[in-house]
């Protein structure tokens, strides 16, 4: 056969020279057809060439073998058999040829291989029956459709090898002409497998370079050579010092040692031999005081207030206290508190006493504020300490009883002994330690054990500069994986000779961890670096310390703690674990990269590849620290262990390299300096806390009483009360997103963007706690001019805005002005290091200003003020809408095609003149900005072409040099499938190629031709296995433990479970790579990449990838291109048109098909709702899970005549056959519904809407009247009179008939708990459903 042009189909006709069959040949074909009917095997199919078959017996000999019918029986008339040629129509032959046309390049004169239909029928020697059977053309083609590819060996060859004497006949008489029919399109070709063979992918192994060390490390073997020993100072030797602090901790009042004191950690300057050096130091600050503000009720005298305060203090055991009356301002969310200057009572008492109980009611006190403020917060605010800095400390007293691991330890009697140093001094050098451990599950698979620990040491690091990532030394400890396989004796000497000093081998894990704890104490690092240190490394270390009773475990921090945090099973208290690191700043490269670096894979080695970081090695092997499993055999030879240790050490170095690349140490330090919080908290990512401290410092300086830490609880209480009255308002509306004018635009698109929209709006309209009235009850609006000055300042004749008003706009203005000044300095700065510092400063200022609005809308922020947040977003919507309306007024030829929150896209209609586009943008900018004072719009970019698909989903060619010639372009993708990690690399590559052509094409015809040809080529290559395995890998993140996933629709969870069975480390948050192979269910088809590589029997499911991974994103990219249709694309790819097409759209369209006829077509609910989860509860007796299905229960009872006389219980355990309480089942059902709703709101897609609607429709039918139309009357009666049980307030069960009795209703008011629960759930989510009452009305 040969190929032809697209659009043609094939029509078959017999060649003129084909000879006719004689009678013997017809008999042979008849027998062959019987064989085809009886055989299900097609293994002996020749691949090509002449078909050879054994010579069949003649018709006469075959007839002799037939048994004679019994005497007296009339022979059954034998129907006339059709010949093969007669039984196959032209259409049948056409289908046959389509099925076996290999590709378009086969010559049309080739013979058709039909050997799979010709198999020898071997009759038994005793003369068995040889019944004749007819085979229609449809049956023939049905069997033909099940045939697979032919093997290379022929039947004749197999027969010869078996030793049988066979006669070979060449069937060259069945030849057909192939004529082209131009009216139809060709079928999809069936490509031959490529280099990948049967696996479905190309097996292309990248040669791996042997791993080797590239850095020179110091030869030290012990950390003691890196640190200064503790310096013992006698009392009186050092009374004043210069102290650089960077961390602090409050001593709880419940402890017996210095309760209510503070510990400051940092570096103390020490003079030695005329040189100043810095040693680690802990300063204990005693005699801290708490401050509480009390607002008297109107009409209460000061004496009454003082007396009541004294009574409260005496009741709580506060014996020492001071009370005085002061004037303060308040401007926040507690109702009833005056917002003008008011007289408050200030209570001060020692920090060793507990916080004051601020709960009322009180007789003369309206409210108590500040009781929840911590001593550490009061210290930072009152001493005006903003970030790490130098302190001049007087009255130092050397500590006799040391409680820290620092070289120096002092105490001071009062916080007033500390003051900020006025002279600007260089930051002291820091010591850094980067920690990397390798763990794997123990033999029982119960817990992680540590096999290798490596610490990279960095001495005398200037944190104001870029951090070097090559360490001064690396210390590494390793233990055997099995006690029966000790480590080689020459391991240390071998590693040292190879350039890796500092390696120590240990007999067991306890010796390894004891050594590690001691080394951390000797190193005395100021900063500890690690990848996922907080989420994994720290937790494992502390658990193993506890399990193995390591006495020096507290060297992980600088406080000599005696008690480890409490661990509850596998649960982790992250805050308690962080407390163990107090005094050492923790820099987690994983969490910081997630905050400051946008990618889809945050594994350390992946980040290093993306950032092009080298580390201290080159080359690679199959071992990845923290993921791979080490076997005793891998730790038996020094050479193999050396390779493993080198990888672990390299990961410790790469963590530092990632931190250095992101420059997060300098950035977080600058953010802390701006906000005035703790540096350690900024490193932990406490973004809202930074804004809280910035506002706390500001409002404290202005004599404002700030909100309590948990003021939102009070607010939520108000909301709960309003909800009961039905008056609770919905959450406020966010930014405006215009409906996009979807399509492909090839002219220039101008992008205008408001600079820092929300901070600018706060400045523009003076939106602040102090100016906006939230107490009047009316809708809040922009504050009028009279709200910009307080009464006291107005009485003093001061101008507006006064010092006590517009605090929030002033803070933002200060940040914006500072950033503008820094950017001005950046333009004239020449030194690279200074320029980097300025870049850090401006970035920190920008992040802080942009986060200011977030504290208003964040529910758990101390300064949460939803009315203000709503006012800001409302003004943002108005500003965007007015800009959209203004643009066509300024230039009627312009068209706004999209807008989102703070930006608009404008179609200019200009094709090739970038200067005209630039001038147009500058003109629009000037005219729009005339309308505002602080709000400013600017040109954010120019697009050469854009493909606009949906809201927040587009791809464009950005003109990077739009201010110049406009010849440089960069592709920008927002929100499309190709930027998500749950699409395989092949899908992303295909989409990228299609997108590049779409954005660069001249017309739609050119695009469609390319897309169809390209997708046809991709489909052929996928089926032929010409792509490598890495192209098919899908990665999904574990959001919970693999065991917690329910159902079979989570392939990554299935793969993760198998990884855990192989003792591989699997954690929540890990990306699980998997490949879909051939199989039935999706979860059964998913395999880890390494499983596929190691098992040649696993084959890539090419059809699944084409229809699920490639077709949908390409279809979405092209759906708005003129002339495109789904049928074109599916035909080019050779898949069914509906397969994978518009998955979300189709699900959304079918979502409303919840008619009674479409759902309830069976009496079995599981058949009506195959996708719904059945309801199962734990039996209260045997604790086994049992299904709940009342309708099935009734049907079972009615089917058994004997059981109808027994006591009937509707809910019975299927295992122990004991009855289940109705209210217990109702409670379990309610909890199940709430869990489904939680999962739905975490997803929220169209598919999730359909799923949750299906699930709750199933539940509604489960506990309602019989659901099937035509359900027997006796079943309905059983449901009504017996099965439908109602629970009364007297805890007695009633039937429906009894519940309908008015006398019973008056006494018991019975209700059906389960049906009531189903209806309650429906009311909560009725916006997702149709009217279900009408759905069940006709039953």
Swiss-Prot record:
<dbReference type="InterPro" id="IPR043502">
    <property type="entry name" value="DNA/RNA_pol_sf"/>
</dbReference>
<feature type="zinc finger region" description="CysA-type">
    <location>
        <begin position="1179"/>
        <end position="1216"/>
    </location>
</feature>
<dbReference type="GO" id="GO:0006273">
    <property type="term" value="P:lagging strand elongation"/>
</dbReference>
<feature type="binding site">
    <location>
        <position position="1213"/>
    </location>
    <ligand>
        <name>Zn(2+) 1</name>
    </ligand>
</feature>
<dbReference type="InterPro" id="IPR012337">
    <property type="entry name" value="RNaseH-like_sf"/>
</dbReference>
<dbReference type="GO" id="GO:0005658">
    <property type="term" value="C:alpha DNA polymerase:primase complex"/>
</dbReference>
<keyword id="KW-0808">Transferase</keyword>
<dbReference type="GO" id="GO:0003887">
    <property type="term" value="F:DNA-directed DNA polymerase activity"/>
</dbReference>
<feature type="binding site">
    <location>
        <position position="1179"/>
    </location>
    <ligand>
        <name>Zn(2+) 1</name>
    </ligand>
</feature>
<dbReference type="Pfam" id="PF00136">
    <property type="entry name" value="DNA_pol_B"/>
</dbReference>
<comment type="similarity">
    <text>Belongs to the DNA polymerase type-B family.</text>
</comment>
<dbReference type="InterPro" id="IPR017964">
    <property type="entry name" value="DNA-dir_DNA_pol_B_CS"/>
</dbReference>
<comment type="function">
    <text>Polymerase alpha in a complex with DNA primase is a replicative polymerase.</text>
</comment>
<keyword id="KW-0235">DNA replication</keyword>
<feature type="binding site">
    <location>
        <position position="1182"/>
    </location>
    <ligand>
        <name>Zn(2+) 1</name>
    </ligand>
</feature>
<feature type="binding site">
    <location>
        <position position="1243"/>
    </location>
    <ligand>
        <name>Zn(2+) 2</name>
    </ligand>
</feature>
<feature type="binding site">
    <location>
        <position position="1216"/>
    </location>
    <ligand>
        <name>Zn(2+) 1</name>
    </ligand>
</feature>
<feature type="binding site">
    <location>
        <position position="1271"/>
    </location>
    <ligand>
        <name>Zn(2+) 2</name>
    </ligand>
</feature>
<feature type="binding site">
    <location>
        <position position="1233"/>
    </location>
    <ligand>
        <name>Zn(2+) 2</name>
    </ligand>
</feature>
<keyword id="KW-0862">Zinc</keyword>
<keyword id="KW-0863">Zinc-finger</keyword>
<keyword id="KW-0479">Metal-binding</keyword>
<feature type="region of interest" description="Disordered">
    <location>
        <begin position="1"/>
        <end position="90"/>
    </location>
</feature>
<feature type="binding site">
    <location>
        <position position="1286"/>
    </location>
    <ligand>
        <name>Zn(2+) 2</name>
    </ligand>
</feature>
<keyword id="KW-0239">DNA-directed DNA polymerase</keyword>
<dbReference type="GO" id="GO:0006272">
    <property type="term" value="P:leading strand elongation"/>
</dbReference>
<dbReference type="InterPro" id="IPR006134">
    <property type="entry name" value="DNA-dir_DNA_pol_B_multi_dom"/>
</dbReference>
<keyword id="KW-0548">Nucleotidyltransferase</keyword>
<dbReference type="GO" id="GO:0003688">
    <property type="term" value="F:DNA replication origin binding"/>
</dbReference>
<feature type="compositionally biased region" description="Basic and acidic residues">
    <location>
        <begin position="27"/>
        <end position="36"/>
    </location>
</feature>
<dbReference type="InterPro" id="IPR045846">
    <property type="entry name" value="POLBc_alpha"/>
</dbReference>
<dbReference type="GO" id="GO:0003682">
    <property type="term" value="F:chromatin binding"/>
</dbReference>
<dbReference type="InterPro" id="IPR023211">
    <property type="entry name" value="DNA_pol_palm_dom_sf"/>
</dbReference>
<dbReference type="GO" id="GO:0008270">
    <property type="term" value="F:zinc ion binding"/>
</dbReference>
<feature type="short sequence motif" description="CysB motif">
    <location>
        <begin position="1243"/>
        <end position="1271"/>
    </location>
</feature>
<dbReference type="GO" id="GO:0003697">
    <property type="term" value="F:single-stranded DNA binding"/>
</dbReference>
<keyword id="KW-0238">DNA-binding</keyword>
<dbReference type="InterPro" id="IPR006133">
    <property type="entry name" value="DNA-dir_DNA_pol_B_exonuc"/>
</dbReference>
<protein>
    <recommendedName>
        <fullName>DNA polymerase alpha catalytic subunit</fullName>
        <ecNumber>2.7.7.7</ecNumber>
    </recommendedName>
</protein>
<dbReference type="GO" id="GO:1902975">
    <property type="term" value="P:mitotic DNA replication initiation"/>
</dbReference>
<dbReference type="InterPro" id="IPR042087">
    <property type="entry name" value="DNA_pol_B_thumb"/>
</dbReference>
<feature type="compositionally biased region" description="Polar residues">
    <location>
        <begin position="79"/>
        <end position="89"/>
    </location>
</feature>
